Amino acid sequence: MFNNKLFRRPLSAMAFMAAILVSATTISCTKDDDDKDNDVVEAETFSGKLTVNFKGSDFTTDNITVRVSDVVFSNSDKTQGTLSLNFEKVKFVPQMPVSLDITVPGVAFKIISKNKAEISGNGIVPLTGGKGYEMYAVTGLTGEITDENDSSRSDDSISFSLKFGDYPTSYSGVEAD
């Protein structure tokens, strides 16, 4: 005769050990994935202040929307890549007859800490309506994106400075609601 009690106990112990092994593997994989998961640079919308120096005078406009889009990581550990900065309905100076949507593509980024990335660019031709404007090529773009990751509040921010052609420009914004 076959004694079921004899085989039941070792199988239960084996099933228990297998469950522990699967759990440990899952936790281990999750931790590794979290280490590589970097959401400092992601598609995000900011609202802030744009300042343009035109003919020696600063023109500042509040509530300007800048979207980060087209985020592409260039390495497997997701610490650097390119993104686009999209200025929405912006007038750089009061004399501009219409507001424009302007995209600055191919902005380089490098994640320097868990919650901060540096952005940079030089010689980037901005686009509006799909057309490039070489006379306003972006030079000297430097700045940073921060992601505080605090669930009680939103402290994500972006700040940068650049030149559109001969016009020094700066932007500082926080994550839009």
Residue ranges and their predicted role:
Residues 116-177:
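Beta-sheet ligand-binding and adhesion/scaffold domains
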Residues 10-18:
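Sec-dependent signal peptide hydrophobic core
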Residues 2-9, 21-50, 154, 159-177:
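Bacterial Sec-dependent N-terminal signal peptides
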Residues 14, 41-47, 115-117:
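Conserved long hydrophobic alpha-helices within structured protein cores
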Residues 3-4, 15, 64-65, 70-81, ...:
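Extracellular low-complexity Ser/Thr/Asn/Gly-rich intrinsically disordered segments
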